[in-house]
Structures are given as C-alpha cells and as structure tokens.
C-alpha cells in the first residue's frame, strides 16, 4: 500500500516502514561515524527500547560499544492492510542492521511493568548472554497495571496545589492559546508516581539481581527530563514532577544495592526533544519550537541520538561524568545554558498565532514530529508501494 501521514492531534495514526528504517539507519550512521566508545558495555538490556531515547540507547550500545542488546517494549505489528506502530518498524530495522554487523539482538514485546515480561527477560539473558552489564530504563507509558496487586494506575499531567494558566500551541491549526489546567487530586498525584516514578525500575533491578543475571560492576540508568522555569509549573512542580522526585529517591536504594558489587545507578537527565510523549504535554510543542529556533542559531541543536551518544561517551562510560549536586548524570546542559534560556524566555510572551512561524521553528518541530512516524525522511520514495506487514527476527512475544 501507499502510506501517507494522517495526523490527529498529537498522534500520527499512520506509520511508514521504509521511513522508520531510514531514520534508524541514519542514527546508526551517526554513531558509527563517531567511532568506538572506549570502555563501553558489551551486554545491554534496554527497557523501553523501540522509540526515542530508549532506541537511541540501544543503537549507541550496539553500534558504538559493539554490545549485544536485549530490548523490551510494547508495540503493535502491522498487517497487510494497516501499518503497525513506529517502534515495531524501528526495531525490525535495528535487528536487520545488527545482524549485518554480527551483533546479538533479541527483543521481547509485552508489558514491561508485568512480572511475566521480567521473567521472560531473565530467561533470555540466562540463555543467551549469561549476564548484563548495563540496564537502561526508558519506559514511557500512560498507565500501569501493578504486577502484585492488579491495581490499574493512570498518569495525569496536572499542576499541584493551584490551577495554572499555560501558553500552548495547537500544532494542527498553528494557533497559540492559553489553557487552564486544574490542580491534581492526591490520588492523581499518587497514581502518576505509581506509573512514572521509580518503583518499576527498582522492581526490574531487584528481579535481575535475585536471578543472578546482573554482572559484577553492572550499571543502570533511568532517563528523565527536568527542564527550566518555563516548564516547571506543569513539569517539575506538577504531578509528573512528583514522579521525577520519586525517581531521585528510588535511585539511592538501587545504587546502594549495586555498589556492593562495584556497580552504580544514576538518573540521566536529557534535553527536551520531540517524542510521542512530549508532544502530548501542553507547553512542550511551543517550548520545543522556540528551543529549536534558538539552539539551531547557536549551533547546539541535538536530537535523541546526539544526546544519548554524548551521555554514553562522556558520562556512562567516561572517566569524568557530568554530575549535578543530586548525583544525576546531566546531558541537558546545552539546553539549560543561561543564554539559551534567556532567549527562549524573552521570546515566550511575544509569540502569537500571527508570528509563530517567524519567531519559532514550528516547521522544524513539525518535521521532527513526522520523522517519528517515518515521514519526511530524505531518500525515501513515499509514492512507492510498501508492505506494512514486517517481521522482527528473534522476537519473543509475551
């Protein structure tokens, strides 16, 4: 079939298999051009491995460090008549590229919050790798079924303590408008922490340790975003921020548990990028459109693969990691540089529906959004007939 983009709000409901493959190949090309990463991990588990930062971590581990990788995700395959999800095609492309280089790659498709997927992951590590020396936690999901109680939690994007009026951008209609968000209830805050906080990361590491599949000296990191003042009401000071603070608490226990065998656990802070998750957050499309404009002018603009490659080379595997006073690894320092934030803050109140194209890089934001779904990528023939039914070799279906 011939597949065209169909965007509804913050989701594109179609995906292009060849475009996703080209996008993955470009990221692999970037990592390979940078050369091997010294002292990199060789057996890597990525939880949330199919899109965005998790995919970038898998690509960096494999093609920058020469690592065998095991990826966990929850994606939808395509059929002859309907495209699958982007992460499905990204993973199929990754597997093909890894096989060409003789790199081990296996994936598990299922609910990463579940005990079943954790057990299948442990079984795969035991059978194929023995142990892993790096665990990347990059799971982004709106809901979680608790594996012990069966309780269902839904995350909420709300401020805490007071209603907040936020400037936002309707990217479909290119209209700048204010949105009032009512404060989260305590249950909504608790549920968001249950979905997006550190409990599941802790459960993963506990399960891997108990099974003996973590190597001595193993490291783990969970990816997060903190942002600056403009996004703080909805982010750091909101319901999501409560989950981020929980991550900062949970990492202390995980770190102590791994330190006994020479290991380490860190939260890694990455810059704001266009992802399916961030596009759903009020404020973020406008903030990102401004950030793109300012950082491109400065020559410091980066996407997922540049960020994660830098994190691996400088901090996860480097001898002088970028640490903040909380002990987090920081890769977001270019975004948070005073001159970038001052420029974004100055432009923020000036943007209107009339000048949004001129003051921001809305075109760049929209192009980046479509790239997530395999569209607008140079070298891809979008008039060609493609088969959306693409298989993933070496896939365990949970």
UniProtKB/Swiss-Prot annotation:
Residue numbers annotated as active site? 235
For this UniProt entry, the molecular function terms from Gene Ontology, in alphabetical order, are: enoyl-[acyl-carrier-protein] reductase (NADH) activity; NAD binding; trans-2-enoyl-CoA reductase (NADH) activity
* Enzyme Commission code: 1.3.1.9
Q: Name one GO biological process term.
A: fatty acid biosynthetic process
Catalyzed reactions per annotation: a 2,3-saturated acyl-[ACP] + NAD(+) = a (2E)-enoyl-[ACP] + NADH + H(+)
Query: Could you tell me which pathway this protein works in?
Result: Lipid metabolism; fatty acid biosynthesis
Please tell me which top-level EC class this enzyme sits in: oxidoreductase
Q: Where is this site: Plays an important role in discriminating NADH against NADPH?
A: 75
Q: Which keywords label this protein?
A: Fatty acid biosynthesis, Fatty acid metabolism, Lipid biosynthesis, Lipid metabolism, NAD, Oxidoreductase
Q: Where do the annotations place substrate binding?
A: 225
Query: InterPro entries, from UniProt?
Result: Eno_Rdtase_FAD-bd_dom, Enoyl-CoA_Rdtase_cat_dom, FabV-like_NADH_b, Trans-2-enoyl-CoA_reductase
Q: What Gene3D superfamilies is this protein classified in?
A: NAD(P)-binding Rossmann-like Domain (3.40.50.720)
Q: How does it assemble?
A: Monomer.
Q: Which NCBIfam families match?
A: EnoyACPredFabV, PRK13656.1
Name the protein family: Belongs to the TER reductase family.
Q: What is this protein called?
A: Enoyl-[acyl-carrier-protein] reductase [NADH]
Please give the organism: Variovorax paradoxus (strain S110)
Q: What is the lineage of its organism?
A: Bacteria, Pseudomonadati, Pseudomonadota, Betaproteobacteria, Burkholderiales
């Amino acid at each position: 079939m011939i597949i065209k983009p169909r965007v509804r709000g913050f989701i594109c409901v179609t995906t292009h298999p060849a475009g996703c493959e080209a996008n993955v190949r470009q990221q692999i090309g970037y990592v390979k051009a940078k050369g091997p990463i010294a002292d990199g991990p060789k057996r890597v588990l990525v939880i949330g491995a199919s899109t965005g930062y998790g995919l970038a971590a898998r690509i960096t581990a494999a093609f920058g460090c020469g690592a065998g990788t095991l990826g966990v995700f929850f994606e939808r395959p395509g059929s002859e008549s309907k495209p699958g999800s982007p992460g499905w095609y990204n993973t199929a492309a990754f597997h093909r590229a890894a096989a060409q280089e003789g790199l081990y790659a296996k994936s598990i498709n299922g609910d990463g919050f579940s005990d079943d997927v954790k057990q299948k992951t442990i079984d795969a590590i035991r059978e194929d790798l023995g142990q892993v020396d790096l665990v990347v936690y990059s799971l982004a999901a709106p809901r979680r079924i608790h594996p012990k109680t069966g309780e269902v939690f839904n995350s909420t994007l709300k401020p805490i303590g007071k209603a907040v009026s936020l400037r936002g951008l309707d990217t479909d209609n290119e209209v700048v408008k204010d949105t009032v968000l009512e404060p989260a209830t305590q249950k909504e805050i608790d549920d968001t922490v249950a979905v997006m906080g550190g409990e599941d990361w802790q459960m993963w590491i506990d399960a891997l340790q108990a099974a003996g599949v973590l190597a001595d000296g193993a490291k783990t990191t969970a990816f997060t975003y903190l942002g600056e003042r403009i996004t703080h009401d909805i982010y750091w000071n909101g319901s999501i921020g409560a989950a981020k603070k929980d991550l900062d608490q949970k990492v202390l226990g995980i770190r102590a548990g791994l330190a006994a065998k020479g290991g380490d656990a860190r939260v890694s802070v990455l810059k704001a990028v266009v992802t399916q998750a961030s596009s759903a957050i009020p404020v973020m499309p406008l903030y990102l459109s401004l950030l793109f404009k300012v950082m491109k002018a400065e020559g410091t603009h980066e996407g997922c693969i540049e960020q994660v490659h830098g994190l691996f080379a400088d901090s996860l595997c480097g001898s002088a990691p970028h640490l903040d006073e909380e002990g987090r690894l920081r890769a977001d320092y270019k975004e948070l540089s005073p001159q970038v934030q001052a420029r974004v803050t100055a432009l923020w109140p000036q943007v209107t529906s009339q000048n949004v194209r001129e003051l921001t890089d809305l075109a760049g934001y929209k192009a980046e959004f479509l790239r997530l779904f395999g569209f607008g990528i140079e070298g891809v023939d979008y008039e060609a007939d493609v088969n959306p039914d693409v298989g993933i070799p070496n896939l365990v279906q949970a």
